[in-house]
């Protein structure tokens, strides 16, 4: 809280807050009560990409899509958001979260024109509803999700006996989550407990930064935390992340180990588009195929900019569509000689 206390003491005039705990518990006190410091949330329309737990499907353990889907069903995001994040996040759902590139519902006719020529390489489910992350909001529940997970694991050849989930050879289901920071341990703890209910042991390994980078560059891990950033116009970065030729290139960004000719074809289509509409269609088709592969367990994102500022700062009534709050404040805010008027004018300042 040192930065927050310095802000309250007047050492600077504006704060963008990333930490949910700080936002919920730190921005309180007399100066907030009397209005000399203001606290607000502004809509965040920036592309979010997808932060997630990513499977390394180079590992035979994760080769079966049913296994990956089952493990994803064990993460109770809604519980995490309530108990750990002060209900301040939204679940991410797409590799292009918060953009027009995110697939929704059934494939559109334009998407089908791209997917049909690839049908022999695609799971038939790709032509159905695009999967959304599982949730535990009523009428759904963790119990139901774990029941579904057990069924998927059984279909994939895993059975529970002698205190663990085991394959046909009797080997227990164990994997390691490689981390570079202990920050993630408290988040992994409830997830690991849920996996234990399935008979799966998830071990957490925290290493120093240099060893972490070496292991990730060498693809020496079962699962990692990563954030694939995205933009409103995806392009060349997709080749390093998801194309087959990047899967065996040490130090590349294909952390999943994905080698899928259908994915390669869709990325090549994205790189060849000539119009915005074609880009949206091809990106949605790619997103659809990736999400049906259950290669990641999606995390969460912040759909607002959490900001606090000193009374007397003026700001434009109209928000930009896409912005980082710190840059916007430096570029467009000002000291106002009539802060009362500015405050009254900006109450409804969210972009239409």
Which residue stretches match the model-derived regions?
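Cysteine-centered nucleophilic/redox motifs
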Residues: 71, 138-139, 143, 183-200, ...
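Short, conserved helix/loop micro-motifs enriched in His/Cys and acidic residues
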Residues: 123-131, 166-179
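Detector for C-terminal structural segments
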Residues: 73-132, 147-150, 182-193, 214-352
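Short, well-ordered beta-strand elements
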Residues: 40, 51, 171-181, 202-205, ...
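Extracellular/periplasmic solute-recognition and catalytic clefts
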Residues: 1-59, 66, 70, 75-95, ...
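Short helix-initiation/N-cap motifs at beta->coil->alpha
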Residues: 1-5, 204-214
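A local structural motif
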Residues: 161, 171-176, 193-207, 265, ...
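Immediate post-signal peptide segment of exported/extracytoplasmic ligand-binding proteins
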Residues: 65, 146-176
């Amino acid at each position: 809280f040192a930065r927050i206390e310095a802000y309250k003491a007047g050492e600077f005039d504006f704060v963008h807050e990333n930490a949910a705990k700080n936002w919920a518990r730190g921005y309180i006190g007399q100066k907030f009560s009397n209005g000399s410091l203001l606290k607000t949330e502004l809509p965040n329309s920036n592309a979010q990409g997808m932060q997630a737990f990513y499977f390394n499907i180079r590992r035979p353990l994760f080769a079966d899509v049913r296994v990956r889907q089952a493990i994803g069903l064990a993460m109770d995001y809604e519980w995490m958001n309530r108990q750990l994040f002060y209900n301040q996040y939204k679940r991410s759902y797409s590799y292009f979260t918060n953009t027009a590139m995110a697939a929704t519902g059934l494939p559109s006719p334009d998407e089908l024109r791209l997917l049909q020529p690839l049908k022999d390489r695609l799971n038939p489910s790709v032509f159905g509803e695009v999967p959304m992350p599982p949730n535990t909001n009523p009428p759904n529940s963790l119990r139901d999700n774990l029941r579904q997970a057990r069924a998927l694991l059984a279909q994939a050849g895993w059975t529970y006996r002698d205190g663990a989930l085991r394959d046909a050879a009797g080997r227990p289901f164990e994997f390691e989550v490689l981390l570079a920071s202990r920050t993630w341990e408290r988040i992994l703890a409830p997830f690991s407990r849920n996996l234990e209910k399935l008979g799966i042991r998830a071990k957490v390994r925290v290493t120093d930064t240099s060893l972490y980078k070496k292991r990730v560059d060498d693809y020496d891990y079962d699962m990692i935390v990563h954030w694939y950033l995205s933009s409103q116009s995806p392009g060349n970065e997709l080749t390093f992340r998801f194309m087959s030729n990047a899967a065996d290139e040490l130090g590349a960004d294909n952390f999943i180990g994905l080698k899928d000719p259908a994915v390669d074809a869709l990325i090549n289509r994205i790189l060849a588009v000539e119009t915005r509409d074609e880009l949206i269609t091809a990106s949605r088709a790619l997103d659809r195929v990736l999400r049906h592969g259950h290669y990641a367990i999606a995390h969460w994102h912040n759909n607002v900019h959490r900001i606090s500022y000193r009374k007397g700062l003026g700001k434009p009534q109209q928000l930009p569509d896409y912005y980082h709050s710190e840059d916007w404040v430096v570029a467009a805010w000002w000291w106002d000689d009539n802060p009362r008027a500015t405050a009254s004018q900006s109450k409804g300042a969210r972009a239409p």
